[in-house]
Amino acid sequence: LNLTIDGVTTAVDYVNNSYYLPIDMDAVQPAKVKVEFGGIGVDFIKIGDKKIKSGENIALSLNPGQNIEMEAGNNTIDKIRSCRLIVTGVPVIELSAPEGIEDENKRPCDIVLTDPKRRTNNSVLRFESYAGIEFRGAGALRYAKKSFSFKLKNRQTNENQDAKLLGLREDQSWILDAMWLDCSKMRNRVCFDLWNDFNTLYYSNTEPEAVNTTHGYPVEMILDGAYHGLYILSDRIDRKQLKLKKKGGYLYKGKEWTDECKLQGINTPYSNSKQAWQGFESDYPNEVGEIEFKYLSDLIQFFAAASKEEFAAQYEERLDVSSLIDYFIFINLLSAYDNTGRNVFWGIYNVNLTLLPKFIIQPWDLDGTLGRTWDAIKLRS
């Protein structure tokens, strides 16, 4: 059964015989909707006691969270198939990955994103694209519900292709966050949105389009014909988002609880021959020959070994103090203990502007906040 309601093609969960219909919660829903369908041997569908023919306008009240029981039938064969229409107030994304999905190796994928608000590429209701998809997050791979990252591509040339999904930035790379450990399904997104409102990049007058973290929206996800749950579709925090300079900009990501990530000292001298060093990853640049950990190493050494006099004389040159103060207040308000060494970005807007590189600090992975630890244990008040 292929089912369309008022021009919106429903997404099918074949495992549970369910049809997902996204509606715009901010719009007034019509009193009547046009029901269109097709399928082998399907002559009518039945909602309640009413038989409906394809193309018929019917009175149907649609509200988010509704589960409407339906039956699909044939006029000559006495056989009825039960199914459900599920109304959701968020967009629906459908992924089809016929070759499977792996870690750190993008596999072919087809994507369909249906947004009743038509925010994609400014007006598109149903966006379809070819893509490469992979699992995302090393620790999260052990969970049943996995996160994904995907890159939009041209099917014929396999070249990367930009799109403006859900009205977010125009880009090729996107994240689907599973929020597996967060029962509220909101911590990461709400905290990022708070940081967006909380903090202003010191160079924002020069770069008015710079954004200090991600933006995203909830979506219902169907993977290979089976409902997979609620996700957050978001853009990425990277050089492009922060508007760091291509020549002179640097972005480092703290991923472990090393002394280096905690700015407590250097146990192993840096090397630019790899993307990773002592729990840090060079997010930008990420090509050997362009990677430079010297600036980060100098910052760690400054924090760990500078005298009081040296620190007082140089800290305003080395750090965007406003950013650091905002970060200190932010992580304490949220009880973000998992963001005090790892899950932190350190960035440089342009190393060529000042005698000493000036660092900004940005949070990442904020699901261990607001009364929960990184592994979902409730904090004592």
What are these regions (language model features)?
Residues M70-A72:
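Conserved structural position at the C-terminal beta-strand
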Residues M25-V28, K34, G38-G39, T76-V190:
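Conserved NTP-binding catalytic cores of kinases and kinase-like/nucleotidyltransferase enzymes
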